[in-house]
């Protein structure tokens, strides 16, 4: 699966996000269940359940004392919830994440290869302005062969 690009969308007053059509057909190949979560509470990540299950399998192989695993699970569980796509192509963003990420009204939905990232539009614009792309970023990508 290769989700890419950005599509503006809206989160309605009930906290539902209509998945943009440009992403919906690709996602439906993986079914109607998703895991919505966050690591920071600033944005939402929407994983097809199959992709999230692969992440969980990798985590299960790590020792329970692994600090990074524990932090990851605490955050993704706190913000996370299994959701189902409704008949109108919408998912319900968990209330705790919706409040933390300020997801009301205008949002941007980014395709990040195998998951979607959803951010408050104002936060996206601020992030682009305050975190400019630099030559160090170019160098880091070059070191990765990109």
Model-based region annotation:
Residues 1-9, 13, 23-88, 96-146:
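Flexible "stalk/tail and boundary" regions
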């Amino acid at each position: 699966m290769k989700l890419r690009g950005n599509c503006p969308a809206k989160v309605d007053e009930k906290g539902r996000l209509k998945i943009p059509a440009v992403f919906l057909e690709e996602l439906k190949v993986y079914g109607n269940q998703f895991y919505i979560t966050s690591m920071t509470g600033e944005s939402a990540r929407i994983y097809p359940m199959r992709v999230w299950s692969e992440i969980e399998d990798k985590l299960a192989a790590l020792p329970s004392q692994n600090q990074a695993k524990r932090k990851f699970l605490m955050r993704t569980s706190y913000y996370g919830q299994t959701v189902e796509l409704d008949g109108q192509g919408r998912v319900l963003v968990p209330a705790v994440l919706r409040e933390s990420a300020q997801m009301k009204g205008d949002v941007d939905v980014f395709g990040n290869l195998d998951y979607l990232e959803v951010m408050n539009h104002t936060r996206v614009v601020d992030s682009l302005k305050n975190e400019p792309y630099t030559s160090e970023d170019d160098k880091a990508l070059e070191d990765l062969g990109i």
